[in-house]
Amino acid sequence: MSTEEEYIKLLDRLYSKLPERVQKVSGQSLPNLIILSIGNNTIIKNFSEYCDRIRREDKLCAKFILKELAAPGNVDENGQLVIQGKFSSASINKIMERFIKTYVQCSTCKSLDTVLIKEKKAWYISCLACGAKTPVKPL
């Protein structure tokens, strides 16, 4: 067997072990958060849709935002995040960017097509585009 045939055989073997590429999250673009200040509350109207788009649970995203803002809040039945206190949309958007960089974006290929996996006490980002598995700090 020639070296070229061996090379082709090894490449085929490699490709058979790689995960299949999955459709990307519509061009890596995310919708803008719709943030309203009503009375002494700040409401993120499209919170559930946003969390669905980045493939993360509402509770997990809410926990991160509320922890960063040091404020109480909850996700209501309409899928809106209601935060007690007035906060600027710029500060909430910065917190969401930090969440995406830490818990959503693949550190290898920068794709947003990832899932968060919890194995025992360790948390990992598993990329659906390149197959990388990156450990992250637990929430």
UniProtKB/Swiss-Prot annotation:
The gene is eif2b. InterPro entries: IF2/IF5 (IPR045196), TIF2_bsu_arc (IPR004458), Transl_init_fac_IF2/IF5_dom (IPR002735), Transl_init_fac_IF2/IF5_N (IPR016189), Transl_init_fac_IF2/IF5_Zn-bd (IPR016190). eIF-2 functions in the early steps of protein synthesis by forming a ternary complex with GTP and initiator tRNA. Disulfide bonds: none annotated. One of its GO terms (molecular function) is translation initiation factor activity. The keyword Protein biosynthesis applies. It comes from the Archaea. Keywords: Initiation factor, Protein biosynthesis. This is Translation initiation factor 2 subunit beta. It comes from Sulfurisphaera tokodaii (strain DSM 16993 / JCM 10545 / NBRC 100140 / 7) (Sulfolobus tokodaii). Heterotrimer composed of an alpha, a beta and a gamma chain. Belongs to the eIF-2-beta/eIF-5 family.
